[in-house]
Curated annotation (Swiss-Prot):
Binding site for ATP: 121-128
General function of this protein: ATP-dependent specificity component of the Clp protease. It directs the protease to specific substrates. Can perform chaperone functions in the absence of ClpP.
GO cellular component term, pick one: HslUV protease complex
PROSITE patterns (UniProt xref): CLPX_ZB (PS51902)
Database matches in CDD domains: RecA-like_ClpX
Protein name in the entry: ATP-dependent Clp protease ATP-binding subunit ClpX
Upper lineage: Bacteria, Pseudomonadati, Pseudomonadota, Alphaproteobacteria, Hyphomicrobiales
GO molecular function list: ATP binding; ATP hydrolysis activity; ATP-dependent protein folding chaperone; protein dimerization activity; unfolded protein binding; zinc ion binding
Oligomer status and interactors: Component of the ClpX-ClpP complex. Forms a hexameric ring that, in the presence of ATP, binds to fourteen ClpP subunits assembled into a disk-like structure with a central cavity, resembling the structure of eukaryotic proteasomes.
UniProt GO BP: cell division; proteolysis involved in protein catabolic process
SUPFAM superfamilies membership: Glucocorticoid receptor-like (DNA-binding domain), P-loop containing nucleoside triphosphate hydrolases
Family: Belongs to the ClpX chaperone family.
Keywords assigned: ATP-binding, Chaperone, Metal-binding, Nucleotide-binding, Zinc
Domain called ClpX-type ZB: residue spans: 5-58
The gene coding this protein: clpX
Species of the source: Chelativorans sp. (strain BNC1)
Amino acid sequence: MSKISNSGGDSKNTLYCSFCGKSQHEVRKLIAGPTVFICDECVELCMDIIREENKSSMVKSREGVPTPQEIMEVLDDYVIGQTYAKRVLSVAVHNHYKRLAHAGKNADVELSKSNILLIGPTGCGKTLLAQTLARIIDVPFTMADATTLTEAGYVGEDVENIILKLLQSADYNVERAQRGIVYIDEIDKISRKSDNPSITRDVSGEGVQQALLKIMEGTVASVPPQGGRKHPQQEFLQVDTSSILFICGGAFAGLEKIISDRGKKTSIGFGASVSSPEDRRAGELLRQVEPEDLLKFGLIPEFVGRLPILATLEDLDEEALVQILTEPKNALVKQYQRLFEMENVELTFHENALRAIARKAIERKTGARGLRSIMEAILLDTMFELPALEGVQEVVISEDVVAGSARPLYIYAEREKEKGSVSA
């Protein structure tokens, strides 16, 4: 039931939303039902939920596998830019799960698994793409850091622990885990230190590549349910990895130079391009990556062979970072606005303030990953003070606030009052 209150001698009744509890003065519209009221904000929230559920049901095609266009459409809701990488991933994931859906139907042709390698700078969306793909297909997902992995028998994390994590995300349902997605980050950090095979044992570099080969290609892994090291008296869960999709990602710093050097060797003669490879953006160079470049970088041939699909991501420019701040469903600006709404305060960012935040992230070379730390630093004092203040209706963030030369503007319900002077 909605609440109705009489304020002192005021004869007017105040109506409240039956769902969120906001009064008619705090919302644009309050719609009356037989015994309840609903505000425009709750109506919009309900519409978002319905749209999301409709999209999830539409994402299933006749065979139960979403089409590449449907996958790309959902990726667009969460990941800004990176059109080429999203297109490659959409096709690869569609083909992978179509292969599983038709397994055993056509025995004359056996379709092999195609794992994926994502190459792009830090903070460009590699991890988010992998997480979103798992959400679209509704399969278990786990993420591993390649830098913590070692060969079996050495101190560190065994590669089979990756499969254990996948099992845990599937609530130990082996059948579901066998259709899951594994994302291995920082894969470039396990590259060989030189082009020549290592003389000494490299247990965290080439050794890890060797250890990953079997589970990526397809094997029956014996996984201890409780994790840790194996011992003979222990019971094991048998997990077939041949249907698990492995997506590996890394920044591959320095790979552009290897590609550029290869380009210089071939750009000779009258028909050669006059533009220097160095003049091109790193993203354009990365898109020309060949398996031989990855071998020179330090990945072993067998490992490169297990990753036949290459998707490259580009550095995010200022425009893309501003879009990331404001447009996706989980956009940072929307998240902080919701936090401020809980204090009944509206949070407003000027357009030039958002661009200043984006420029800061570019200067720090942290990509989209650095946006949250910048936002936290800007809003820290405000979030500390706000719960103890009364009557604040709106907080405005300008470019000067981002630069640190001014305090946020506090607008009060009864009067407009600036919190602090123009200079900090």
